[in-house]
């Protein structure tokens, strides 16, 4: 068995273990976010019930992707959790996601885009509930944020972020009343 295949198998096994321990989805009573990039809409969900709808969100200026690379301007699809909050962000308020996930990292490792050391560091960050490093080819610091002092007309008419999901400042303030650390976020 090749070293790459061995590490790939070992890492996928570890990833499945993390999913089982952390849970792949929110329980029926928890609030979670469903972000529909095609409709440019963020849904605040409780179980399978829509609680609130935020329309005209902006995504990455170059669309969406399942295999994001640093500085590509694309919003990564996937299942995340909010890991950190910056209420002093230049974007008004920033909810940081746990991107890259172990799944993103394992795929990138199998495609020779990150090293075994980088893969292991991303896994360890997830195990500890910390923000994964953004210094790999996968990038990082992906989240949900406001516009800050940006031009609201641009936000309403264009996808403008470097990969994040953006709402108006008013929308992000309203959303902040309902979500926090650990909130599940699905970007599709």
PLM feature spans:
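Bacterial N-terminal signal peptides
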Residues: 10-23
